[in-house]
Design a protein with these regions (language model features):
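Residues at alpha-helix caps and immediate loop-helix transition turns in enzyme cores, especially N-
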Residues: 35, 99-100
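Hydrophobic beta-strand segment of the Class I
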Residues: 86-87
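Hydrophobic adenine-recognition pocket in adenosine-nucleotide-binding enzymes
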Residues: 91
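A short glycine-rich, Lys/Arg-flanked "PGG" loop and its adjoining helix->strand segment in the class I
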Residues: 101-116
């Protein structure tokens, strides 16, 4: 099932972007036609990284730094890649604290002081998992598809904990949505 969902904060990512400037985008999730079409209006390089297909991302017992190694293997970006926009969607609802720390350790060298990010969290920890795939259809609208199967590892974090975990980002704005999710706008804090 596919639906369109309004976004209160997505347009803020693009308000200071010059359509003629080069843009580098990290999209966590599969490459969907709506997102590719949306970004075709910009001079940009899209990096699609479907970490959702790797879930659950957990440390291997008795293997030191196994999470760091897993993310280093999954996130092999070309040297000199710096993301202007990161689209995390609801990834952090499916990652434990250690996995988030390792993910950010690997991502941080690819951020710059002007990097911005967008994502979703939950307002109520008892909120059911969304199990959705997101694509950008317009500056203020997302195309949302229901996943065929439930994602493993759903364990959302409260917003206060997420602010601590996402140490290389500052929470600029968050908006409570009707389904008790939080839409978040983040900026790099390096």
């Amino acid at each position: 099932m596919t639906s369109t969902q309004p976004s209160k904060l997505l347009s803020n990512l693009f308000e200071h972007i010059d359509e003629d400037a080069r843009l580098t985008v990290l999209h966590i999730g599969p490459a969907l036609p709506e997102t590719v079409d949306f970004f075709s209006r910009y001079r940009c390089k899209l990096h699609f990284l479907d970490l959702f297909s790797e879930l659950p991302i957990e440390a291997e017992e008795d293997v030191p730094l196994s999470l760091d190694k897993q993310f280093a293997e999954l996130m092999q970006f070309p040297a000199g890649t710096y993301f202007d926009i990161c689209l995390f969607w609801d990834l952090f609802n499916y990652m434990g604290s250690d996995a988030i720390a390792s993910f950010l350790l690997t991502l941080r060298p690819h951020l710059h002081p002007g990097s911005l990010a967008h994502g979703f969290a939950v307002h109520n920890l008892r909120s059911p998992p969304g199990d959705q795939i997101y694509a950008i259809s317009e500056l203020d609208a997302l195309t949302v598809r229901q996943r065929a199967t439930a994602l493993p590892g759903y364990a959302p974090h409260p917003q206060s904990r997420l602010k601590t975990l996402l140490s290389c980002f500052r929470f600029d704005r968050s908006v409570l949505l009707a389904d008790s999710r939080l839409e978040m706008l983040l900026s790099a804090s390096l």
